[in-house]
Amino acid sequence: MSSNPFHLFGSPSRNDSVVVKDEILSVQHLVKKYGDLTAVNDISFSVKKKSLFAFLGQNGAGKSTTINIITSILSKDSGKIYLDGYDQDHYSDLIKSEIGIVFQNSVLDPLLSPIDNLEIRAGFYGLRGAFKKERIQKLIDMLGLQSFLKRPVGKLSGGQKRRVDIARAMVHDPKLLILDEPTTGLDPQTRISVWNLVNDLREKTGMTVFLTTHYMEEAEKATYAVVMDKGNIIAQGTPTQLKNQYSGDYVLVYGKNNEDWENQFLLQGRKFTYNHDSNYYRILVKNSIDAIDFIDRNKNLLTDFEVVKGSMDDVFLNLTGVRNMEEGK
């Protein structure tokens, strides 16, 4: 798969019959059961190379189980997994060498410095000598670790730890980087800085990122998204496709509750709700063009309005009945 010296498992032949040119990961009819409980129920999806793939679902949806199977932490009951055409059933160690993972809870040794953590991890993957030093230095520069490189990890801020977590996951130059709730527990400004970093890494390295998150605004940035619920895939597509299918734009019309307004909305076949606290109607529209038409038709009724685009939060609510996911899984 790669000529880098820290890929220790040679270059076995892959099954070109299952290789799709622009796919890095293919999951086919995956099943995992725990007794009578089906944690993952015959799911199939693929991840394109160089993409940001979002894997979404509330607690117990099957996300963690699926990731643990992809990374060979758990065995599957049936199904196939291919990474860049290599069958996990035959090349599990090779596939593991091509995946990096940032866990929700940091696995860094808090008593050691970032440089010590990176050197230990690099040694685990067989990096030695000048190549090891060069790879670690590249990560230090790329992720901006220099200013706290020798400070104990336990004394770093949340954002600094996340940078080191990402460096650790990338030390072996993986083709697929899994980010499992990477910004949970971070303040909004730090979350933004982490995502700026991830986007910068994708641009510089061409690496594919597989994301799980309960922050729906992060899923908005994905190339493609899969939504899980109770072990099943209940929707998948680009964020735009999902919003068009499972959400919608809406117009906020401000003013006091007015029966004449409501009669007009009903005559036009509009779905609406009224917010008593903020005194506005929320009228569902198909898209921005429909919003403009609605505003034009009702301009004599309106004192003020606001057009709001449908969001991934709306998609998630409509699919699962849950406004947002709890932290964790």
Please report, for each region that a protein language model flagged, where it lies by residue:
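Conserved catalytic motifs of ABC-family nucleotide-binding domains
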Residues: 173
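Conserved ABC ATPase "signature" region
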Residues: 119, 123, 130-148
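Conserved ABC ATPase signature
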Residues: 152-156
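Catalytic Walker B motif of ABC-type/P-loop ATPase nucleotide-binding domains
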Residues: 177-180
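Conserved ABC transporter NBD signature motif
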Residues: 79-87, 95
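ABC transporter nucleotide-binding domain
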Residues: 197-285
